[in-house]
Amino acid sequence: MHEIEASERELQSAVAGRDMEALERLLGQEFTLTTGRPGHEVRGRAEYLEVTATRYVIEEFRFDELEVIELGPGAAVVRSRYVQRGAMDGVDRSQPFLMTDVWAHRPAGWQLVTRHVSPLASSGP
């Protein structure tokens, strides 16, 4: 398994398990999440961590597709089709998503610097 693919899977497992120590290590200080959801189109790192720790519940997830595109020795893009069963603030978020992640290699290892998520029609995991 590619090192960046392993980091991608570790990150999503950390989100599902609310492993804040792993998320602190895997998310760059400049991290942003772009969702396009009204009122929360873009979340910064601190808000993302707070939501993940307290309001977002993932019961099950999988990657149906995952492609790593290396941009050189210090950067990569990961495109994926991701499916989850979960909720945020009690609202069902069980559906597939298209995700585009940008990773940067830092002295401490690979870090996610930005994620763009596009929800697709619900189909359940």
Q: Where are the predicted features?
A:
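Short, well-ordered beta-to-alpha junction loops that form the rim of enzyme active sites
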Residues: 81-82, 116
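Short, surface-exposed beta-strand-loop junctions and turns on beta-sheet-rich folds
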Residues: 84-85, 119
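Short beta-strand edge/turn micro-motifs at domain boundaries
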Residues: 96-125
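Amphipathic alpha-helical repeat scaffolds
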Residues: 12-13
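Hydrophobic beta-strand positions in extracellular immunoglobulin-like domains
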Residues: 82-84, 103
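A solvent-exposed, acidic/Ser-Thr-rich amphipathic alpha-helical stretch
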Residues: 2-5, 17-72, 80, 91-95
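A short, structured loop/turn motif at beta-sheet edges
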Residues: 68-76, 103-109
